Amino acid sequence: MPTISHFSRRATLILMTLILLGSAFLRFYGLGAMAELLHGDEAYYGLDALSLVENPRLQVYFPANTGREGLWMWLLAPMVAGLGATPFALRVTSALVGILTIAACYRLGRESLGQQAGIWTACAMAVLYWHVQLSHIGLRVITLPLMGALAFAVLFRAHRLGRGWWLAGALVGITFYTYTASIMYVGYAGLWMLWWAWHNPKQRRGIASALLMIGVVVAPLLVSRLLLTDATPSVLRAAASDAQAIGQNLVNWAWAWTGRGDVSSTHNLPNRPVLDIPLVVLAIAGFVGAWQLIKQKWMLIWWAGLVAVALVPTVLSVETPHFLRGAGLLLPCVMLLGVGATWLTHWRYGRWLVVSLLVIAGTHTLIDFDTWLNTESDDFGITYDYRVNEGLYLLDTLVDSDLQIMMPGVVFHPTAAFISAGLNRDIIFYDWLSDEDCYLSPITEYAVLDLPIELNNFPNRVPPFVETLNTLVEDPELDYRIHTITPPQAITSGWESAPTFGEAISVQLIPPERATFASGEPIAFQLAMQINTALPRDDYRVLVHLQSDPTPYEGGTLYATGDTALCSLAYQASARDSDLVALQPLSLTLPDDLPAGEYHVAIGFYTPDTFERLPLMPTENAHDYHRAWEFSVSE
């Protein structure tokens, strides 16, 4: 039987087609089961891609979520545009990139090790569990092995043929847009080009063009990173603390290949090693056969160096072995396996042994990923992502599609934001602190996804601010509750004619149920405020005065005051939809000696330092207060 290196172009095409079909099966398997499963980091990418669809622009760096390079969002945007804002759109993009990586690995293996090794390198990447797992999650790291393989393959081709340097430089530069750790690949490629230029004067001009192209391509991202430095603290937080920690990281990675792998259920079937027994056999064969098979010995140095530079980002960080930060190791790993497979095929029945080992490894990968789907997918992401996934999709089936969704107690949740966008539903987040005694409410019926892990005791806190509370679902483990709420009748209309202060705060007072009180009684009521524009300050106070006719401004008596700070939620509402109303409880205590008669509550807003009041429109008086409610005091 001839070796693959003697196969025709047609035979190679058939083999690669079969390999790609097998890799596609492994990477598309389980996507249906993950259709309603979304990680917070994936959601951030999806939201950025959605923003590109809604507002097309050339943006190379996205500062949200500690800052991310732009290539992944550019790839996601057309899929989100075509398939909608769904977890499936993100994951199918990742799977497709993973499949393309198999083809790129063939090219890299062929350029560096020969055609036969290229075939086996592609096979190794196709069945490697590490890469299959990454191909199922919508994180930008999946682009690193693809662009790394393409960049190095074209770079080696340019070095071999003495042409195509500009394309090599462009691909190396684009690699910088994949993942934080890509800086090691880009820097390493640059060092090799400088080395080649030193030893081969004929290639200096081409290498110079490649280096120039790298500089041109990476410059926009470098500038954006320098201008947006918010990502720096996150990098430092993930850094190893000292030399002892770095040493332990090296030990952890040494053990990760055959012993204990990444513990994260996002990146791995927890603790699964990189290599199972069939791939360990190929790896050992790779170490044995590398010197014999690799004719250009400098390639061995390049290979070892690639391992070293790919280890740097993960060895210098925490939580090793970390299969995201260490993703640069995928290429040297599968190249080692490809060399091992090639070496074994020189032995009698070696080809069948290699095929058997790869089939077994692929079967292990399929079984282990199925195990991950059945046992670990609930832990996919941060603590409460799965609650949001399950709760929102269930809410969508139970609640009318035109109802707004509220998530009080959550400042912002990317998973909920992306899923709600895909469901074409409006969702509002706001931080409802435990000591916050006011509330944000839509003016029409709305739904609430209540996460007890984020906001304790919502059903007991909200009744003073609602007309009715209907709990549709209460998860047995209290992971989430789903409510529908009818707001107070008083805030559902009348805003067009409501008095407005400073052209910013429209008000309506929600009075007590009765309008007659006795002296000495406390009176509790709510002030409903619709914020029409951003407030210029964050320290306004609410004027709450008990008056009668004549008013204090006309020589009458100011009987009581209940002035208080404007609640913080009013400032949150100022940046949101005008249909959102801040409800702030207010109170006055009637003096014990208050005479019987007719009284009114005056409402206004002022600054605490100058006591300057916000002007009232339409004007009711010269003192910018609104006569909000009238009541009687009995004998």
Which residue ranges define each predicted feature?
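Active-site-adjacent beta-strand anchor residues
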Residues: 39, 145-148, 406-409, 448-449
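Extracytoplasmic/secreted proteins, especially bacterial periplasmic and envelope-associated proteins
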Residues: 44, 70, 74, 249, ...
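Residue-level preference for long, well-ordered alpha-helices that form the structural scaffold
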Residues: 41, 144, 380-384, 575
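Membrane-proximal, lumen/periplasm-facing interface regions of secretory-pathway glyco-
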Residues: 34, 273, 352-402, 406-433, ...
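Membrane-integral, polyisoprenol-dependent glycosyltransferases
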Residues: 2-241, 245-345
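C-terminal luminal/periplasmic domains and tails of membrane-associated envelope-modifying transferases
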Residues: 392-405, 411, 418, 424-635
